[in-house]
Swiss-Prot record:
Keywords attached to this entry: Cell inner membrane, Cell membrane, Membrane, Transferase, Transmembrane, Transmembrane helix
Gene Ontology terms describing biological process: glucan biosynthetic process
Localization, UniProt: Cell inner membrane
Ranges that cross the membrane: 1-21, 26-46, 77-97, 108-128
UniProt lineage: Bacteria, Pseudomonadati, Pseudomonadota, Gammaproteobacteria, Enterobacterales
Protein name from the UniProt record: Phosphoglycerol transferase I
UniProt keyword Isomerase, yes or no: no
InterPro entries: Alkaline_phosphatase_core_sf, DUF7024, OpgB, OpgB/LTA_synthase_biosynth, Sulfatase_N
Keyword Nucleotide-binding: no
Gene name for this UniProt entry: mdoB
Broad class of where this protein is predominantly found: membrane
Membrane topology classification: Multi-pass membrane protein
Pfam families listed in its UniProt record: DUF7024, Sulfatase
Entry-linked NCBIfam families: PRK03776.1 (NF003000)
């Protein structure tokens, strides 16, 4: 209703101003600004819905103040460009319409009415309401009801008798199981769901809407609210250290806790969370690659679901035989947005909707088949009678190729339980949310019927039942939940551990690199993750007077304040204000002691603008002074004009990447010497090893032969044509996820370059 009202007010404002207000520059500018704000808000709402499927939520608020980088972003570039072009077109059209009758005399009354209607359209828009509520949640001190409803459970189960298998289905919401809406999409897992306790109304709340957040909610009974973006949790050393979560209780009760997934455990700090709360046995992409039958059988995120669930079955079988009380948690990945992945063992690899194949539905149909096969193995085993199986979605599906069809339905998270000790078949329509999952499981295992804000759905009352406005209520509790992190409020002395890549201050530890915004009563950590911008881009968003401490590789800050360290990959510490003074210190000891020293100096806006502009220079445009191309730092020597076909810097150097160009091309500003030696330190990847690799300068071509290990080879060139471009053409680029950022499409690697040096031997 508010959406229709806001649109009606917007159109009324446009029509009244265009036809009645007449000409006046001030009123035109004011009205266009407010109407333009309405357009921006609604485009933001549309764009947010595209990424999250949940409008402008907590994750979007973070993204609006940081650049979106990381997993799968390439697939969103085109929609982003489209939105930007649409915004320009709409503003142009709006300005043209408002000035249609600019030659008419100005009328104050109609101008005022048009402006008031424009303001009303903004106030009535859903986007404005969502942003207002989010901003309020950042400014509140907390909610008095938090202390009433937050309950800490007993640390042990008195007499545990049942083992636990808990399966998180990536984005595998209950909506997919509506056979009327999506016929025969989930026959195997749907049949199992109908055999157990099926909770049909599990809603999604703020702070529970992505994987690590859904895991925290289901095990600790709280949303994942933190003083940083949730997927950046990998940088912290402990995770809600004061909370008692399901894993803690299980461990205290004699359980061995296992977690198995196909993706890297470091992503979003799942390893930190699980280790902080009772899990001693973790298996992710790195741990599984030495034990799976085919280590090369992977998708963009890690190992396929059939591989992961096979390993989970082996763990279940071995643990059951041992007689040890255990819990086994596993997380699938094949249904990850935007498209999903199809494992090779599925019987049904294709699902058509609206008369055409749909990749996301196909991935769901395949993944649920794999999950059902895993469950049926457990059910057929002699150990099922001592086992409770839980199947839940980690969160609702984000914007995938099935999303518009899902949104036509009443959407809920999946949560059902199969009890081997006491089979029970029932569909329960009680209103609940994912924070209730852990408490429900804990009670079945013999423990308390509450964890945090979660309640057992069989015997307690969920917050979703208590509060009609439960989403707003949870946002109001955000400051209370953030306080559970027990983060320090000041930093004076700190220690950088060079070997462990950690910084410690005021009793807290963080992984490096790290950026800190420091104020009188708050220290805000800004870690770097797959989903966040590089720290220098985050620093560029600081105000001129914001105090900062930035710990990163020296070369990243050298271009600003320490040119002598431009090629250093050691750790450096910079602190100061972007509009004032900055210092850079080289971390030259294993245990390096530092102190904060923020000087109250005059703010220089020219200095501030220059610093911000330099911080925002993209990696490939950075230039440094050196007599060779050093590939493990960003940028290139000053003599290089541009380069292509080269991937990002890694600790050892850079790979060629045929996804970015069929050949490696390095174009110099001036012609290369008439006669020179080309000294290349590099290695080959895959089938490129021990094969001739063409290297060209102008019309002359030499061949380079590399092995899998790094070696240095010198090639001799004559350059009579004064060519200025070096071309290296790996013969057999290999599509691989080797060293890839989680969730990115595979790279096509050829050679790994450490250093290239041009040595003039002319004359």
């Amino acid at each position: 209703m508010s959406e229709l009202l806001s649109v009606a007010l917007f159109l009324a404002s446009v029509l009244i101003y265009a036809w009645k207000a007449g000409r006046n520059t001030w009123w035109f500018a004011a009205t266009l600004t407010v109407l333009g704000l309405f357009v921006i808000l609604n485009i933001t709402l549309y764009a947010s819905d595209y990424f999250t499927g949940d409008g402008i939520n907590d994750a979007v608020l973070y993204t609006l103040t940081n650049s979106l980088t990381g997993a799968g972003v390439g697939k969103y570039i085109l929609p982003g460009i489209g939105i930007a072009l649409a915004l320009v077109a709409v503003f142009g059209a709006l300005g043209w319409v408002l000035r249609r009758r600019r030659h008419h005399p100005h009328h104050v009354g109609y101008s005022l009415l048009a402006l008031l209607l424009a303001l009303g359209s903004v106030d009535a828009s859903p986007a404005f309401r969502q942003i207002t509520e989010l901003v309020k949640s950042q400014m509140r001190d907390g909610d008095p009801d938090f202390a009433v409803y937050y309950k800490e459970p007993a640390k042990t189960i008195p007499n545990p008798k049942l083992n636990l298998v808990y399966i998180y289905g990536e984005s595998l919401e209950r909506t997919y199981f509506d056979n009327d809406a999506f016929p025969n999409l989930t026959p195997e897992l749907g049949a199992l769901k109908n055999e157990g306790l099926d909770f049909s109304h599990t809603m999604q709340l703020p702070g529970t809407d992505y994987t690590i957040a859904g895991m925290v909610a289901s095990q600790c009974g709280i949303p994942l609210f933190a003083p940083f973006e949730g997927n950046a949790s990998a940088s912290v050393s402990s995770f809600f250290p004061q909370n008692i979560c399901l894993g803690d209780i299980l461990k205290n009760s004699g359980y061995q806790n296992y977690f198995v997934q196909g993706a890297n455990l470091r992503f979003a700090g799942k390893d930190v969370f699980l280790k902080s709360h009772g899990f001693d046995n973790l298996y992710g992409a790195e741990e599984l690659k030495t034990v799976v039958a085919d280590p090369s059988y992977r998708n963009d995120w890690g190992f396929y679901d059939d591989t992961v669930l096979d390993e989970a079955w082996k763990k279940f079988e071995a643990l059951s035989r041992s007689g040890q009380r255990f819990s086994l948690f596993t997380l699938t990945v094949d249904t990850h947005h935007p498209d999903g992945f199809i494992s090779r063992t599925c019987n049904r690899k294709r699902y058509d909707y609206d008369g055409k194949p749909n990749q996301s539905f196909s991935a769901v149909s395949c993944s649920q088949e794999n999950i059902a096969e895993f469950i049926n193995k457990i059910k057929a085993s002699p150990w099922f009678k001592d086992t409770v199986i839980v199947v839940s979605s980690d969160h609702l599906a984000m914007n995938n190729t099935a999303w518009k069809y899902l949104n036509k339905q009443d959407r809920n998270n999946l949560f059902f339980i199969l009890r081997g000790d006491k089979p029970q078949q029932e569909t329960l329509a009680v209103k609940r949310n994912t924070m209730d999952n852990g408490a429900t499981v804990l009670d079945i295992l013999g423990g308390d019927n509450f964890i945090g804000l979660g309640r057992n759905s069989l015997s307690g009352q969920s917050l979703s039942e208590v509060f009609l406005n439960v989403k707003e209520k949870v946002l109001a509790m955000k400051p209370d939940i953030i306080r559970l992190w027990n983060f320090p409020k000041e930093i004076k002395d700190f220690t950088v551990d060079r070997d462990k890549n950690m910084i410690a201050f005021s009793g807290s530890h963080f992984r490096l690199p790290l950026l800190l915004r420091v104020s009188d009563k708050r220290v805000e950590p800004l870690p770097e993750s797959e989903y966040s911008a590089p720290l220098r881009f985050q620093l560029a968003d600081f105000a001129p007077r914001d105090n900062f401490v930035w710990i990163d590789r020296c070369y990243k800050m050298a271009q600003l304040w320490a040119p002598a360290l431009a090629l250093s990959t050691d750790w450096c510490v910079s602190q100061g204000q972007l509009g004032g003074q900055q210092t850079v210190q080289h971390v030259d000891k294993a245990q390096w002691q530092g102190k904060t020293a923020f000087k109250d100096t005059m703010i220089d806006m020219e200095r501030y603008k220059g610093n911000v502009d330099t911080l925002k220079i993209v990696d490939n445009d950075i230039r440094y002074k050196a007599d060779s191309f050093i590939f493990n730092v960003a940028g290139a020597p000053e003599e290089v004009k541009q380069f292509s076909g080269i991937s990002r810097p890694e600790s050892w150097g850079r790979w060629s990447n045929a996804q970015l160009g069929d050949e490696v091309k390095i174009e110099y500003k001036a012609p290369l010497p008439k006669k020179f030696d080309l000294v290349i330190t590099a290695k080959a990847f895959g089938d490129n090893a021990e094969r001739p690799i063409p290297v060209r300068v102008g019309n002359e071509e030499q061949t380079l032969v590399l092995g899998h290990d790094v070696s240095t080879i010198t090639l001799h060139f004559n350059n009579p044509t004064d060519a200025n471009t070096l071309v290296i053409a790996p013969p057999a680029p290999v599509s691989t996820n080797e060293g890839n950022i989680l969730g990115h499409s595979p790279r096509k690697l050829g050679i790994g370059m450490v250093e290239i040096k041009v040595v003039n031997v002319e004359g």
